[in-house]
Regions:
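Residue-identity detector for glycine
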Residues: 11-14
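Conserved pre-motif I regulatory segment
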Residues: 17-62
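Conserved nucleic-acid-binding Ia/Ib motif block in the N-terminal RecA-like helicase ATPase lobe
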Residues: 32, 86-143
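Walker A/P-loop NTP-binding motif
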Residues: 50-57, 70-85, 108-109
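Short, cationic motifs built from Arg/Lys/His that form the positively charged side of catalytic pockets
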Residues: 46, 57, 69, 89, ...
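The conserved Walker
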Residues: 63-67
């Protein structure tokens, strides 16, 4: 059994050094997606969380709205996805339907050039039969 590493990322990031996305050792496909979204420099939460999460460590991150938390966990998730495996590999839980849809949209943008990666938001109020069918081939489930 492997020991889990847990790190808490919290605090005032206003004075923290940030990194450029090309310094984060992300794949060229994800880097292109990031650039298409108009970003060159990672936010403080991204600069701190992405390198730790890419090692496989478990993290808990806390930052204000609009600081890039979705990319902070989404980029490491995308780096770990095995495109050839066409079943769920990652489950992301969100407190609301709106956040699940928003997170799925952002992760799809990041994965724009990762052909063969399927991101699927699942939430209540939808036809369960359609959602079960949509699970086929999805590697990242967000609900």
């Amino acid at each position: 059994m492997h020991a889990l590493s847990l790190r808490l990322l919290k605090g005032n990031y206003g004075i923290m050094e940030t990194l450029k996305f090309n310094e984060l050792n992300i794949s060229p496909e994800i880097f292109r997606g990031v650039k298409d979204m108009g970003f060159e420099e990672a936010s403080p939460i991204q600069s701190k969380a992405i390198p730790i999460a890419m090692t496989g460590a478990d993290i808990i991150g806390q930052a204000q709205t609009g600081t890039g938390k979705t990319a902070a966990f989404g980029i490491p998730v995308l780096e770990k996805v095995k495109k050839e495996i066409k079943h769920p590999q990652t489950l992301i839980l969100c407190p609301t339907r709106e956040l699940a849809v928003q997170a799925a949209e952002e992760i799809r943008k990041l994965a724009k050039y990762m052909h063969g990666v399927k991101v699927l938001p699942i939430y209540g109020g939808q036809d369960i039969t359609k959602q079960i069918r949509a699970l086929k081939g999805a590697q990242i489930i967000i609900g």
